[in-house]
């Protein structure tokens, strides 16, 4: 159990939060109350379902409503990403295309396409390369806003996780009614052309699901300010691939009305792997005994590569890996074991005797390869 888990257990016990939510509906808690145990910024950042403290169980979630107040309740706050290349929850008539080739003009000398590590860097390259123009069918999108800002005032309804949940007075037709008043929101990138404002939420790590609030709060802010349509886009950059997913809110007053409109994959490299490439890889591969590694339980190879990319920046403890990927700490070992099986990472003790997962020479060599080289290797 992590420190965050421990602190939330103390808060739940002190304020009898679970019982109050069950009997009376949403429970409001202040930043000052949370700060008695740990910094609120660290205690309220749960970007995936799996990152929620265990005391929240499978139905409770937390949302900010002002600069200093949060609400805890039986809220359905997360949405699953579709399987990459799969149908997911697409609007009828749309499809997932293959990986499109993009390019950066050769006069940009400051950009190394083989060393795009940060979310901000990936968003910059996405704009410069014309990826966003192609994906949204726009013309010359330019970045106009980014960073933290106040949400303004708005109300919305959010659905409960469980069907048949007890309905207090604040329960509406579609869910609980929540009022937001100048909560802090953050936009990774806002791009505008003549007809559209595209709002980008960027990640450089692969997750299975995401917190809808990351798109919904900024969407409500800008949808209330602008005459032109606001198009929320989630961008994930990993393994040299830009994955863009456009969403829409079919009812702007309903948090859970989110729908996936379309998905696109882009790369600055050649990603086509031929049968000849595969045959050559097979012919030069020597058969070796399997290493003595426990049974591999990792279920996403994309996350394995994403972990190696993060280890290239610095060694990570299992707890830090769990924080980066937004899952339980035990799952850190699932993905470490997959990396270890492939010879990409090992566990070592640092000077303070803390166990850290460290990238191997083979892992660093892998990341120096282009997309095709990584997949074939």
Set out the residue ranges of the language-model regions.
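Nuclease-adjacent, charged terminal/linker segments that flank catalytic cores
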Residues: 1-116, 120-121
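Nucleic-acid nuclease catalytic cores
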Residues: 196-198, 203-211, 222-252
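A short mid-domain helix/strand-loop element embedded in enzyme catalytic domains
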Residues: 132, 137-143, 181-197, 297-312
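Donor-sugar nucleotide-binding helix/loop cap in glycosyltransferases
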Residues: 257-377
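Low-complexity, highly charged intrinsically disordered N-terminal segments
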Residues: 105-158
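Active-site metal-binding core of divalent-cation-utilizing nuclease and nuclease-like domains
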Residues: 139-190
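Extended, well-ordered protein cores
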Residues: 115, 249-252, 265
